[in-house]
């Protein structure tokens, strides 16, 4: 990794700041809903000059990743910090893909501090400790992190199957221009090799393929679109027919990229 090469060449000690509580205050999928709580900043030495002089680039990279990795849920459990808000569950409906009780897909709704499955009624409130409080007869994971980890494991298992395929009809915009009109539409498919698009862009037939190897990850807006850079057409935002599938595409693609890169070393 380039950051590890830079650190090795510089040879200077590296300090790191780890922020606790920011995700629980304002998560990237909450659509701006802020919770009142506490944020702590922890300063630590990530690497000394002596360590840098003897570490491999991979060891340097691993040390850097470990120094900035955070787990707000573990921090909350150890610190006991509570969060207040009347929209604690906002955005959850866009990342809870599978119901743990009835296995329905894309069935969750959220309003205020509550989530519920539109298929079986499985429901819970989000408490001040950001853990789920299941309502009568409901079955939910302990918190959002545990739910996402369970889903991610299933997405990865699906992606490892030989016949793996995700497909969706899409509408397309130029990335970064969310208020602009759509510039195209078509079909987006992801298999174990990469992402394929076929459709119309700017009034012309368009087709392209992006190999997982050159795409280290997918970003976008949960519940809405995926961002995919493309050489001929620039950065594009693909709005899936089922926006709640964005997280599924994201985790599957990141796994397939990592698997390809690892196999080459």
Please identify what each model-predicted range represents.
Residues 60-74:
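Short, structured interface segments
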Residues 105:
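Metal-cofactor-binding active-site regions of metalloenzymes
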Residues 74-82:
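Mid-sequence helix-capping/hinge segment at a functional interface
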Residues 216-265:
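Canonical pleckstrin homology
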Residues 165, 171, 175-225, 237, ...:
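Phosphoinositide-binding peripheral membrane targeting modules
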Residues 132-187:
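Anionic N-terminal interaction surfaces
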Residues 108-109, 126-127:
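Short, non-ligating residues that shape and space the ligands of small metal-coordination modules
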């Amino acid at each position: 990794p380039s950051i590890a090469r830079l650190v090795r060449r510089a040879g200077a000690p590296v300090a790191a700041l780890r922020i606790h509580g920011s995700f629980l205050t304002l998560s990237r999928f909450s659509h701006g809903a802020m919770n009142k709580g506490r944020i702590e900043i922890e300063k630590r030495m990530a690497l000394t000059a002596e360590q840098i002089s003897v570490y491999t680039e991979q060891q340097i990279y691993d040390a850097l990743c470990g120094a900035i990795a955070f787990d707000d849920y573990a921090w909350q459990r150890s610190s006991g910090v509570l969060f207040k808000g009347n929209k604690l569950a906002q955005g959850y409906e866009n990342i809870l893909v599978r119901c743990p009780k009835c296995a329905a897909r894309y069935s969750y709704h959220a309003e205020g501090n509550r989530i519920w499955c539109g298929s079986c009624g499985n429901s819970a409130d989000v408490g001040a400790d950001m853990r789920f409080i299941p309502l009568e007869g409901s079955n939910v994971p302990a918190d959002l992190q545990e739910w996402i980890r369970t889903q991610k494991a299933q997405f990865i298992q699906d992606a490892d199957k030989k016949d793996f395929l995700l497909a969706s009809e899409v509408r397309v915009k130029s990335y970064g221009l969310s208020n602009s009109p759509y510039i195209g539409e078509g079909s987006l498919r992801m298999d174990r090799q990469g992402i394929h698009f076929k459709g119309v862009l700017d009034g012309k037939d368009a087709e392209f393929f992006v190999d997982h190897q050159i795409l280290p990850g997918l970003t976008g807006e949960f519940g809405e679109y995926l961002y995919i850079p493309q050489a001929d057409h620039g950065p594009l935002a693909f709005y899936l027919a089922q926006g709640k599938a964005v997280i599924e595409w994201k985790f599957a693609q990141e796994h397939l990229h990592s698997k390809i890169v690892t196999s080459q070393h």
